[in-house]
Amino acid sequence: MAMAAASWASSSSFTRFLRPLLSRNSSPSPISYSLHRYKSANCLFFSASSNKPPKLAVYAQARRVLSSKTKGDEIATPADLSFVVPLKIVEYPDPILRAKNKRIDNFDANLKKLVDEMFDIMYKTDGIGLSAPQVGMNVQLMVFNAAGERGEGEEIVLVNPRVSRYSRRIIPYEEGCLSFPMIHGDVKRPESVKVDAQDINGTRFEISLSALPARVFQHEFDHLQGVLFFDKMTDEVLDTIREKLVALEKKYEDRTGLPTPESINTRKIKKAAVGFGKS
């Protein structure tokens, strides 16, 4: 498993395929991910397949768990879960991306419809992962499919997810985000995570993810915490995308007639003021 993860991180051909990570690009050697359930082992197995020998094998063990609600979580109302079709991607610096996301407590046909619509817009915008706040819904819900193609791989839905464990090994990798069109940068993340969540029917389960699925999950989970991927970039990486972030802030002001709710340049000044800026 460690060798497979190392191959995933270091292989140049595989790197080109996955870049930008959360905004799919075409590749002459497509790799698809499938999720298989083995009843005897009660586990899930992500595997990579392509015209070349597989470079990634990710094992994810899942089991039913009983878990109480997280204290202090506000419960989403029917109004919080109402939406208009088609969904639209919310772009930085819209304050929706920073707002607190409410816990889902109603697992009905409306939620299933929302999930379907999220997958639909995700595929149409060439994404492999999407969180509810990215479509204007401040609730704790994410969807992803590492294959990035409808009918391929496996569609994963996580409701009210919580991380119970992160691996100690940290891996840097270039990411993109549907809320930041044409912007990519290196982000360091743990190689694997253990997650407690609910499925579309409200059933709780625990799952361990590694490599690509773990990274996609962490990116989307950050969204549910109001954290954006550039928040975790080094100053050096951030400087390479600063002008594009400023352009998105200007686009927001032009579209809404409102001042930008946050400024990447102000953020840099504040960091410097408390001793974390560049010398």
UniProtKB/Swiss-Prot annotation:
Xref: Pfam families: Pep_deformylase
Domain of life: Eukaryota
Keyword Protein biosynthesis: yes
Record's keyword annotation contains Metal-binding: yes
GO terms, biological process: translation
PANTHER family, alphabetized: PEPTIDE DEFORMYLASE (PTHR10458:SF22)
Record protein name field: Peptide deformylase 1B, chloroplastic
Organism the protein comes from: Solanum lycopersicum (Tomato)
